[in-house]
């Protein structure tokens, strides 16, 4: 119990102490991206490019058909959450491409 005032009575009575914060459990890190995994995925993306369904989804996103793109990706990857993550990833790629094109001009 971290105390605000060293008082003898009340909710905050007792000695002033600092809370002992423990490390998070190892099981909590599932799904986190490590530096190595990110590097490998980026390398593969650079070499292989995008899958045909990803290219089509990016075309849909270019013409502001976000909902249609989500439905299309969901059909391909299986679940709604994975589809949302993939759509977000592809829209970030498009934004980066637009930014690079604007910087080049």
From Swiss-Prot:
Keyword tags: Acetylation, Cytoplasm, Ribonucleoprotein, Ribosomal protein
GO cellular component: cytosolic large ribosomal subunit
Subcellular localization: Cytoplasm, Cytosol; Cytoplasm
UniProt keyword Repeat, yes or no: no
Residues annotated with N6-acetyllysine modification: 62
Keyword Glycoprotein (UniProt): no
BP term (GO), one: cytoplasmic translation
Protein family membership: Belongs to the eukaryotic ribosomal protein eL36 family.
Role this protein plays: Component of the large ribosomal subunit. The ribosome is a large ribonucleoprotein complex responsible for the synthesis of proteins in the cell.
Protein name: Large ribosomal subunit protein eL36
Organism in which the protein naturally occurs: Bos taurus (Bovine)
